[in-house]
């Protein structure tokens, strides 16, 4: 019975519809969490695609006070935002010089730079580095 209930939850008609976010105003943003989703087929053999020019950004997840959103740019099933619109908005965001939070910041910020979005901010916190220090 429990298995059937769990399977029922997985059926498409029970999944909430994803709503495309709008680009919110970023003026005055103090801190932002950033996570990139990428297609990086040769990461295990050549390293990060941002450094080897292999692969591409698939989407960008952003969270700051009052906003949590995901901006797909190269999903195979569509629903993508125009890449240039996302890049333009990200450039505005980083010009506010927020504290940037990432998990594996070298990777995400490397991809942003390869993608044409410089994240020249004063402070970056990396939870990949911080996590072992907390334990």
Which residue stretches match the model-derived regions?
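Conserved RNase H-like, two-metal-ion catalytic cores of nucleic-acid enzymes
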Residues: 2-135
């Amino acid at each position: 019975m429990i298995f059937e209930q769990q399977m029922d939850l997985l059926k498409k008609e029970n999944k909430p519809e994803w709503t495309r976010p709008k680009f919110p105003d970023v003026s005055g943003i103090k801190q932002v969490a950033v996570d990139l989703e990428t297609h990086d087929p040769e990461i295990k053999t050549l390293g990060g695609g941002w450094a080897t020019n292999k692969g591409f950004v698939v989407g960008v997840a952003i969270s700051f006070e009052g906003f949590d959103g995901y901006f797909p740019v190269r999903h195979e099933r569509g629903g993508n935002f125009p890449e240039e619109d996302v890049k333009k908005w990200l450039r505005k965001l980083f010009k506010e010089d927020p504290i940037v939070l990432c998990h594996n910041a070298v990777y995400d910020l490397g991809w942003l730079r390869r993608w044409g979005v410089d994240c020249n901010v004063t402070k970056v916190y990396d939870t990949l580095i911080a996590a072992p220090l907390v334990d």
